[in-house]
Design a protein with these regions (language model features):
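Hydrophobic adenine-recognition pocket in adenosine-nucleotide-binding enzymes
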Residues: 104
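Conserved acidic residues
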Residues: 97
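Class I (Rossmann-like) S-adenosyl-L-methionine-dependent methyltransferase catalytic domain
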Residues: 1-94, 111-115, 119, 129-163
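A conserved beta-strand element that flanks and buttresses the S-adenosyl-L-methionine
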Residues: 100-101
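Helix-to-beta-strand junctions that scaffold the AdoMet/dcAdoMet cofactor pocket
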Residues: 109, 124-125
């Protein structure tokens, strides 16, 4: 099973474990770095939890996810159309004030991460903000039906040097 198959087949299980998690402390730190009504790309929006929160705070949000089933749920939950798109297909330039990639791009292989981080840098406006999160460590591979690239400080610094 690949990662998208996992999310498409275990949608309800994933949603029930994430949609009600209070992430406002981290979300608010991110939002504090943006202008009011800034345009945010929720890059791998999952259940739509963060998209909904950002919209409720008055921000403009474009939300994408690779999973067809998560896009369906998130669209209804957040009240906006969530576009089904793969991270590798991001091709916009200077389009967003902020990019929120919460526990999403960690599903890419290390080599893909370099390319996608570069695309994110091109898609965010000058002085824009990018948030991303990884599981801590150096593991790369399949875990519980999904692919993960974990990062510690050294691995993340190495990745960021390449973009």
């Amino acid at each position: 099973m690949n990662t998208l198959d996992y999310y498409n087949s275990k949608t309800d299980e994933f949603i029930s474990s994430t949609v009600d998690v209070d992430f406002s402390k981290t979300q608010d730190k991110f939002l504090a770095k943006l202008s009011p009504k800034a345009h945010i790309l929720d890059f791998g929006c999952g259940s739509g939890r963060d998209t909904k929160y950002f919209l409720e705070q008055g921000f403009k949000v474009t939300a994408i996810d690779g999973s067809v089933e998560l896009c369906k749920f998130a669209s209804e939950f957040a009240g906006v159309t969530v576009k089904q798109m793969y991270f590798q297909d991001l091709d916009e330039v200077d389009a967003y004030d902020g990019i929120w990639a919460c526990a999403s791009i960690l599903h890419l292989h290390y080599g893909e991460l370099q390319d996608v981080l570069g695309k994110m840098m091109r898609a965010v406006k000058d002085n824009g903000v990018i948030y991303t999160s990884f599981k801590y460590g150096t593991f790369e591979g399949e875990r519980n039906g999904r692919y993960f690239t974990d990062c510690d400080e050294a691995k993340l610094a190495e990745l960021l040097k390449c973009v």
